[in-house]
From Swiss-Prot:
One of its GO terms (molecular function) is DNA binding. PROSITE patterns: RUVC (PS01321). It comes from Dechloromonas aromatica (strain RCB). GO terms for biological process: DNA recombination; DNA repair. Mg(2+) 1 binds at residues 12, 144. Keywords: Cytoplasm, DNA damage, DNA recombination, DNA repair, DNA-binding, Endonuclease, Hydrolase, Magnesium, Metal-binding, Nuclease. GO terms for cellular component: cytoplasm; Holliday junction resolvase complex. The active site is at 12, 72, 144. This is Crossover junction endodeoxyribonuclease RuvC. It catalyses: Endonucleolytic cleavage at a junction such as a reciprocal single-stranded crossover between two homologous DNA duplexes (Holliday junction). It comes from the Bacteria. Binds 2 Mg(2+) ion per subunit.
Amino acid sequence: MSITTPRILGIDPGLRVTGFGVIELHGKQLVYVASGCIKSNDKESLPERIKTLFAGISEVIATYQPNQAAVEKVFVNVNPQSTLLLGQARGAAISALVHADLPVAEYTALQTKQAVVGHGKAAKDQVQAMVVRLLNLPGAPTADAADALACAIAHAHGGQGLGAMATAGYRIRGGRLIG
């Protein structure tokens, strides 16, 4: 990887499971590097779980050496307690990224889905299918890893969705990526 090659770490934060995905942008081509999940033990205290997420993301950064990061923004849940817990997990992720001196971009789930699938109301399986297609993967990553990869893809295309992909040379018809 040269210093000019964007290597983007996408993060889908969660207290139980945080997805990560690393891609590179070679000219106009997206290249898959790695993806996976960082899991915390729900039997541990909240501070221990936050520590696990911070350490896990720090390890991903050390292993894959990204030079940019994209994180999914928190949505307001019906349950305020769930929203607060998700916000704390997101804070751990952003702290690890900033601690590694990475620039951090933030995208809502709607922006990410719009960028990858073409509409903001896409189901998780649609996001997974488009991630597989855009990155030419042999199989579908887990939902959390796919969401993280989708966030990285949205960032790679400037968060501009399928319009940016068409400009990058992808063929789009009726809001869908084709052959």
